[in-house]
């Protein structure tokens, strides 16, 4: 099975700028509640992926998002892991 290359921080930031709502501070939990421009919370995508083991393309299909949006959410998660992990623990347990 081929491994996919993890994007660089600059590549992550480019996707985040394009696909993640830049006004995350308007959400109740701030950066932990950031959403894609389609309105899907990043924490929900990450929690769903953990629970299902879905790969990027399966996750994109399940949420009717492009793979690039999922990549942006994963990049945002890498940059804000402690906030999003806390949000997941509060919500999912």
Ranges and model annotations:
Residues 68-79:
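Major-groove recognition helix of helix-turn-helix-like DNA-binding domains
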Residues 38-54:
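Short, amphipathic alpha-helical "recognition" segments used to contact nucleic acids or chromatin
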């Amino acid at each position: 099975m081929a491994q996919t290359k993890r994007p660089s921080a600059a590549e992550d930031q480019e996707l985040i700028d394009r696909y993640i709502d830049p006004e995350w501070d308007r959400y109740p939990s701030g950066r932990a509640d950031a959403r894609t421009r389609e309105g899907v919370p990043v924490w929900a995508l990450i929690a769903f992926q953990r629970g299902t083991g879905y790969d990027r393309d399966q996750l994109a299909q399940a949420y009717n998002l492009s793979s690039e949006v999922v990549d942006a959410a994963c990049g945002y998660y890498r940059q804000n892991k402690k906030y999003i992990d806390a949000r997941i623990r509060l919500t999912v347990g």
